[in-house]
Amino acid sequence: MLEKRLLRMGMRLQLLRDRRISSRGPGLHRAKADPQQQKRLTTGLMTQAETQKEAQQRQAAMRKTALWHTGHLQPKTHTHTGMHTQTHRERERNTQRLRDRERRENGRHTHRHTHTLTHTHTHRDTHTASYRRGIETHTTRQPLRLRGSAHDENDPRVREQPRGTQADLSSRSRMAARLLGRLTPTNTVRAGLRLGSRAASPDPAWGFLIVVGPL
């Protein structure tokens, strides 16, 4: 008898353990169902969920179609994903930018815009034009050449000139100094004449300036 009772209690505990039911009662949790029955229920629930999802998708498609026909919704003809939809304020801002750009292209600038563009444009163009004119018109600085120097001898332009011209200039300056010495025979003027004759150069004006200038 005792063995039978122990066997029954063991079977009962095993059954409770399989069903995960506390010895104090079933409690709030549901009993563990049969695996085959659970699989059948899961398949049925999945089928029902798929059916409901398809029905909701069809209803949403019908709503979109109705909105397209009434013009309240524009269809997405592009294939880009993740594009930002412009709001009404952004659309108005972009439209205003396009208007400003067209106004600038047509020449109807505002005062502020005209002042900025005119100043920058004039300033830059003036400097660029003057710089270009300076490059085109101004030649490189020529070195100072003295007659009778080494540079003068190597210069083809000077070599082409006859030496008789230089001799004529020096003789003319000496003749002018002699005439002035006869007109004003003073020691001071004679000293100036000597200095002028010594400093006689290809340009006769140098000796003349030394003679006439105040001593």
Swiss-Prot record:
Superkingdom of source: Eukaryota
Protein name: Protein FAM27D1
Source species: Homo sapiens (Human)
InterPro entries noted in UniProt: FAM27D/FAM27E
Ranges of compositional bias, category Basic and acidic residues: 87-108, 123-139, 149-162
Polar residues: compositionally biased ranges: 163-172
Chain intervals for the UniProt region annotation (Disordered): 74-172
Any single Pfam family the record assigns to this protein: FAM27
The family this protein is said to belong to: Belongs to the FAM27 family.
Basic residues bias spans: 109-122
